């Protein structure tokens, strides 16, 4: 099961989606911890060390305590919530408290007020951006696959195990 930490999003700033992190958690590890399995399309907002990384899960995932995960419901579409959070991430980060590491608590995030449009307007927005976001998801996954292929092939080319003709 994919285990996502804020560190996994540190190189993900220009990406909207995430499917895997550096590590995984086993079913046993999940069952014997306070971790929760989050559904596909959950929004992941890092709320400590550092505050403000944001992504949408491409599959079921678990996160560490550095995140507040949001599961969109019937009220507002997930893509609308994503862009709403993205627009307000600096203001959310300013709400962080702590001496060693700043953190935004669940209560602080729950009470963070933003003006909301009507659900009709928000749904119209989501209707327009959904095809674009879905295409972006496909392109990001293709880029990740190309990066994996490059990382596998480059050492082989460098040490002579493979040649390009």
Q: Where do the protein language model's features map onto the residues?
A:
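Amphipathic alpha-helical coiled-coil/heptad-repeat segments
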Residues: 75-76, 80-83, 87-91, 95-102, ...
């Amino acid at each position: 099961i994919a285990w996502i930490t804020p560190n996994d999003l540190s190189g993900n700033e220009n990406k909207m989606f995430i499917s895997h992190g550096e590590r995984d958690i086993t079913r046993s590890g999940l069952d014997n911890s306070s971790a929760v399995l989050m559904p596909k399309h959950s929004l992941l907002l890092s709320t400590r060390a550092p505050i403000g990384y944001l992504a949408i899960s491409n599959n079921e995932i678990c996160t560490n305590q550095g995140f507040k995960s949001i599961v969109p419901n019937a009220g507002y579409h997930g893509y609308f919530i994503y862009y709403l959070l993205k627009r307000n991430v600096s203001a959310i980060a300013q709400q962080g408290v702590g001496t060693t590491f700043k953190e935004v608590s669940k209560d602080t995030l729950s009470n963070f007020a933003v003006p909301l449009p009507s659900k009709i307007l928000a749904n119209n927005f989501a209707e327009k951006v959904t095809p674009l976001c879905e295409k972006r998801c496909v392109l990001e996954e293709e880029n990740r696959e190309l990066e994996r292929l490059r990382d596998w092939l480059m050492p082989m080319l460098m040490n002579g195990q493979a040649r390009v003709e």
